[in-house]
UniProtKB/Swiss-Prot annotation:
UniProt pathway: Protein modification; protein ubiquitination
Gene behind the chain: asb11
Consequences of knocking out this gene: Morpholino knockdown of the protein causes a reduction in specific Delta-Notch signaling.
ANK repeats mapped onto the chain: 36-65, 69-98, 102-131, 134-163, 167-196, 199-228, 232-259
Pfam families named among the record's database cross-references: Ank (PF00023), Ank_2 (PF12796), SOCS_box (PF07525)
Name of the protein: Ankyrin repeat and SOCS box protein 11
Naturally occurring in which organism (per UniProt): Danio rerio (Zebrafish)
Amino acid sequence: MAVVHAEGNVWIKQWDHRFHMYGGQTCSPLMAGSWDDRTPLHDAALQGRLLPLRRLLSQGYNVGMATLDGITALHEACVGGHFTCAKLLLEHGADANAVTFDGATPLFSACCSGNPALVSLILTHSSAHHPAHLLCSPLHEAAKRGHTACVELLLSHGVNVDMELPSVGTALYCACEVKSTDCVLTLLILGADVQCGRGLDTPLHAACRVGGAKEAELLLEHGADRTSRNSEGKTPLDLTSDQSIKHLLQTAGTCSLSQLCRWCIRRSLGQKGLNKTKTLCLPHMLHNYLLYH
């Protein structure tokens, strides 16, 4: 029994990062600590071994074969960030919209890897829009992991920047929680609503809670309300112990008229409208000011 237990620990340790990736769900008690439902195709894709993958496909392995929890070889290639392997699988008919037991799509997995070329490839074979019934959002995952290029790609394909997931919040809120400064800036510039977070908890609440001074400063520059209260009646100032953030919140002065106008125009235009500002025939300097260039 001890031998079996030890062997199980080896397997769990080896694939621990994948349990984290897909939520750690086990479809059957018989499969606990085992990967017997995986095929050599899955292993080759995960490890980025192009030649073995090509050989297995030529031998007739089913490109769409999924494990009990719905993981396909394409998911594996995307998790590993292996562009050429994913391209080969797609050329052989892999389903770019396949969904795992935990709701992860190949696009979600590609965003986890942070490979923008791979994300772009998957987007040519699938929709960028996130199904309402899935909790695994590619945009949120890219934002949480600091993959700015992936965030930009998704938004350029029309993904809703202010999509709020239950108990998770918006992508901006997630980026503030992990202090991903570049992603926070990118999301704000590309039209994220600075007040949309998780329920009444705003991105500024999140940034102050985790001591994100740079994030808090960016949020204030884009019009965040430092007096807003969450469901517990707390303001961002109430949630921080960071002295630099406290100083920032307490000394923030009255905004200039030009700033107020910029925020008002940006909110009126929204995410889609910001992409069409060139049609407004504004002076070059004013156009750049509006877009924070």
